Amino acid sequence: MGGAMLAGWLAAEVPASFTVVDPVATEVPAAVRLLREVPAERFDVVLLGVKPQALNDAASALAPVMTEQALLLSLLAGAELASLAARFPVNGGIVRVMPNLAAAVGKSPIGLYAADLSEAARAAVTELLAPLGSLEWLAGEDQLDAVTALVGSGPAFVYRFIEALAAGGAALGLDPAQAQRLALSMVEGAASLAATANQPPADLARRVTSPGGTTAAGLVVLDQEAALARLVADTLRAARDRGAELAAAVRG
């Protein structure tokens, strides 16, 4: 996720210098400094993108090099503000951030939550993240597990749906590669229309549907016993619950 955000910042030509600390990365863009270990320098903004299980080690290495007014942006699913504050004694603020891979192209929805963040820090975070997509500040930290499921994990679910559409098209006789191109282009176009139309998706679906037509026949299958709605709800719930499990593990 951090790599996608970095790509988005570089594409937007954000006026900042970037240092990536990664013991296994082999290459980064030319404008980025890659280090194997945390340097003996001071940083004003730290983006934390490790696995939750590595939080303690990351904190031991990073906390000493953060300036007194540094901002910590955490991508860690399940790592709550209290857990982060106990490991990173910073005054600038701690913000939990949940984007997705579309940050690389400036199209990610981004859920954010912080407590006791100054107006100046909030403005700085907004300015930094705005090039990556659309920002949604959340009213409560308890909403982040749901945002992680919907926004962070959501692209994988959409990709699976595109894969299923392509496979279904191939099963109807289309060339598999052609079916995949058609499915991808269809989803891209439908999403673009939904994003620009001043109508809810349900209304757009009705616009496509003629009584007794082909679309109506397909929707009968999708809507039978609310099959699609139940499947999606169960999928998001499973991802949400896993986030809660990760939070419990971080709390110890």
Please give the residue ranges for each predicted region.
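Rossmann-like NAD(P)(H) cofactor-binding subdomain of soluble oxidoreductases
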Residues: 5-7, 21, 26-28, 35-112
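A short, Lys/Arg-enriched amphipathic alpha-helix followed by its capping loop at the start of a domain
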Residues: 8-15
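Short pre-catalytic strand/loop immediately N-terminal to key active-site residues, enriched for Gly-Thr
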Residues: 95, 143-149, 201-206
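NAD(P)-dependent Rossmann-like dehydrogenase/reductase catalytic/cofactor-binding core
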Residues: 184-252
